[in-house]
Amino acid sequence: MMNSKLFTSASIGPLTLRNRTIRSAAFESMCPGNAPSRQLKDYHCSVAAGGVGMTTIAYAAVTQSGLSFDRQLWMRPEIIPGLREITDAVHKEGAAVSIQLG
């Protein structure tokens, strides 16, 4: 199975993934105050350490009125440092990270 094309690197535009496995978005409910948390960071680092090529942070609202659930991520300038922390930590594990906007 390890000889499968699934485990070979792949490029998406300028991004090269270490393999073709991608953790799809599934609502984590790990964003108290609608901001990234240590729990969210640890979760995605664990997924990355497990070997996926890319993990996806789920269901981020782009406006406050777009929030559907408690503990849902809300995209705004003040959360950028927290997202940067997650991104850096996931990259350190060798994976890429994406985000689902909704």
Regions found by a protein language model. Give the residues of each.
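Flavin-dependent oxidoreductase catalytic cores
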Residues: M1-G102
